[in-house]
């Protein structure tokens, strides 16, 4: 048994509070040459050690529970300060952590037997020679999780509450602690009359490992973590740039939350053989199984080897509302200086038609900026003259600008991503997977066999891909209003109002192929055999199935996005002088694309006997021209698989003023295509007893053309058409600038 020691200290000083609490597991330690624990009821071992130099025996008519104890630390702290004129600050923090203290059962020979259930949680069993765990009920062994949690919040307020800042961080993380069973040369045996469930375990033996039960389940250990960040500010901010100086006052808010899910694979490792037997089903998910010799897996009503997914989720929100003022230099002057600095890039007209049009638009824009800048610096209309003689020049009034503004913005983004925690099955010699009444399903798994692999099922054998899903979305909006002033004349000049926003979303699925690599012969026997998102390779093939389907899998995704914007400005002194701009864009795309074709390949030939063969964009055959793959079938279906990756975004804008409108256009286009040809390499066919060539059946026989990109186009246009140059006002502007 165990006890819990508690140590708690508190210091409370009103505005300063500190608390520390520590809880410690105090376990028992039992040491002897031979140890025998027996009970007519239950046996519970918590955070304790049972160590025998010879035999360790634990026997009970009731349940046997061998579980971890727990240490924990809790720290709480609060501080606050108050100053004059409404100024104050405060800080609050919490830290909490737990640590599991494993129970350990150690002996040269270890025997744990219950007439009910055996539960081993976060604890370890070590049998230096031989270990046995038996139960008439269930055997459950699982890892546990250490926890770390923290919370921290700071708040500051300035003069009369005009400025303030609050920052909150919260973090939580679980750490996987596997439960281990170690065995010596005579191996390890788990024998349950009901269910054997292993989750987050490491079972290792220099001898053989035997796992038996009605149902045998092997699972990963799932851990979660999250972090939250929240920040609220109220106050002043400023910036300096070549265009001027600005200062603003307002409120900014940021919130972000991230959730992470991790899968830690279980491990079954033997220096000899691994035997897994279930009278009902074997289910293994995200597991690593390795045997130096043979791996034998048998589930009378089915065998399932699959994966679990890690995931990442994040949601971020931002908002801001500010009142500001700025003083600066006319933007046309700043732009002209930048254009002169980048004149080499600006006049580069290489590339495709879209590139040339983009640069042409930039050049015309630079000329227009130059004209504005010239007029701003030197006004040629002085004294009514139309030329730029020295006596007629006047320093312009539009060099410096000033404005006051109100702006509000909001944005939100979210993302979800998954990654597969694959399973792996490895044997140095042979591997046998059988189901006498059911099916064999293998997904997202890497199988490697040194010698022969035998798959046998009464119903179906399916070797397929695993899925990784992702989604994303985002939106933003901005609203603004500003008043600009003429610094020289001391009056309000222009009123401007604007609004803009964006929206986007996307989702998709990526397929991660299973792989099977066999050093010797791959033999299968089933009603149906399906290879979907799988790459299977063996020295020789011996395939027997009524229906054989081999198909490649397409990654799929779609996306949609849009934007809008508009602005209106008017000269308050001369209301007939105004401008309005409206712009927007809309895009969408979809993708169906095979990353890697499904394949069934023999290095040195073999045979396939089937009633019906279906090949959809996959590759079958032999690497050896002299040792071909021989396929016997009554029916063959051959289909190529066509991929596409298409996206198009069309947008533009129009600016309306007192003269001819100015038009801009935006066009992005991606158009790609790929073909995955159903291919048969070095393969002889016999269809309904008649020899037939692969070409006659419609197969591609050139491995270099099995997967081929047939279209690859990408164009991007973002240009102003400068249609306003057709108007007299812009022509006069250029004429005036040209006369200086």
For each of these PLM feature ranges, what is it?
Residues 1-740:
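Binding/recognition "hotspot" determinant
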């Amino acid at each position: 048994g165990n006890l819990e020691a508690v140590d708690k200290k508190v210091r409370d000083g009103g505005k300063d509070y500190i608390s520390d609490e520590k809880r410690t597991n105090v376990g028992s330690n039992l040491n002897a040459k031979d140890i025998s624990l027996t009970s007519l009821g239950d046996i519970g071992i918590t955070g304790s050690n049972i160590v025998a130099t010879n035999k360790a025996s634990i026997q009970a008519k009731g349940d046997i529970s061998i579980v971890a104890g727990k240490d924990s630390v809790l720290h709480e702290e609060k501080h606050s300060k108050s100053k004059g004129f409404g100024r104050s600050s405060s800080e609050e923090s919490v830290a909490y952590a737990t640590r599991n203290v494993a129970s350990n059962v150690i002996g040269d020979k270890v025997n744990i037997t219950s007439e009910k259930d055996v539960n081993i949680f976060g604890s370890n069993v070590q049998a230096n020679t031989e270990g046995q765990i038996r139960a008439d009920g269930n055997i459950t062994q699982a890892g546990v999780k250490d926890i770390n949690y923290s919370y921290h919040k700071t708040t500051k307020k300035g003069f009369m509450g005009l400025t303030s800042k609050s920052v909150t961080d919260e973090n939580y993380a679980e750490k996987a602690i596997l439960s281990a069973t170690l065995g010596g040369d005579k191996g390890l045996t788990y024998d349950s009359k009901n269910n054997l469930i292993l989750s987050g375990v490491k079972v290792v033996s220099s001898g053989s490992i035997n796992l038996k039960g009605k149902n045998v389940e092997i699972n990963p250990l799932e851990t979660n973590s999250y972090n939250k960040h929240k920040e609220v500010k109220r106050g002043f901010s400023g910036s300096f740039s070549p265009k001027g100086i600005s200062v603003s006052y307002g409120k900014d808010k940021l919130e972000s939350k991230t959730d992470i899910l991790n899968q830690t694979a279980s491990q079954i490792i033997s220096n000899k053989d691994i035997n897994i037997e279930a009278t009902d089903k074997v289910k293994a998910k995200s597991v690593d199984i390795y045997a130096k010799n043979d791996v034998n897996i048998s589930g009378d009503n089915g065998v399932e080897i699959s994966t679990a997914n890690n995931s990442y989720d994040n949601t971020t929100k931002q908002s801001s509302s500010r009142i500001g003022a700025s003083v600066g230099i006319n933007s046309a002057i700043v732009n002209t200086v930048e254009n002169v600095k980048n004149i080499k890039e600006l006049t580069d007209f290489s590339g495709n038609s879209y590139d040339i049009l983009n640069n042409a638009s930039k050049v015309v824009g630079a000329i227009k900026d130059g004209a504005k800048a010239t007029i701003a610096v030197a006004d040629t209309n002085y004294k009514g003259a139309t030329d730029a003689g020295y006596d007629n020049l006047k320093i312009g009034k539009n060099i410096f600008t000033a404005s006051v503004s109100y702006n509000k913005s909001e944005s939100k983004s979210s993302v979800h991503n998954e990654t597969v925690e694959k399973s792996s099955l490895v044997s140095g010699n042979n591997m046998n997977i059988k189901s006498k009444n059911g099916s064999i399903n293998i997904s997202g798994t890497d199988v490697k066999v040194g010698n022969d692999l035998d798959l046998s099922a009464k119903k179906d054998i399916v070797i397929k891909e695993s899925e990784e899903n992702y989604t994303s979305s985002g939106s933003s909006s901005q609203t603004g209003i500003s008043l600009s002033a003429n610094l020289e004349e001391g009056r309000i000049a222009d009123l401007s109002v604007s609004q803009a926003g964006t929206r986007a979303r996307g989702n998709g699925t990526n397929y991660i192929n299973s792989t099977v690599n066999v050093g010797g012969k791959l033999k299968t026997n089933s009603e149906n055999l399906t290879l979907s998102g799988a790459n299977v390779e063996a020295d020789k093939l011996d395939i027997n199935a009524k229906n054989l389907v081999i198909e490649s899998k397409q990654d799929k995704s779609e996306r949609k996005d849009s934007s809008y914007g508009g602005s209106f400005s008017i000269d308050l002194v001369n209301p007939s002088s105004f401008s309005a701009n409206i712009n927007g864009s809309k895009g969408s795309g979809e993708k169906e694309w095979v990353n890697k074709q499904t394949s069934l390949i023999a290095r040195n030939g073999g045979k396939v006997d089937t009633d019906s063969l279906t090949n959809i964009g996959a590759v079958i055959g032999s690497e050896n021209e002299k040792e071909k793959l021989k396929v016997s079938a009554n029916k063959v279906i051959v289909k190529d698989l066509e991929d596409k990756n298409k996206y198009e975004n069309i947008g533009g804008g129009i600016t309306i003023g007192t003269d001819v409108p100015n038009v801009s256009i935006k066009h992005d286009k991606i158009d790609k295509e790929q073909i995955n040809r159903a291919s048969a390499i070095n393969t002889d066919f016999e269809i309904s007893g008649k020899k037939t060539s692969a070409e006659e059946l419609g197969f591609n026989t050139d491995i270099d053309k099995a997967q081929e990109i047939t279209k690859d186009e990408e164009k991007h246009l973002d240009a102003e058409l400068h249609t306003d140059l057709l108007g007299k006002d812009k022509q006069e502007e250029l004429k005036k600038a040209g006369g200086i």
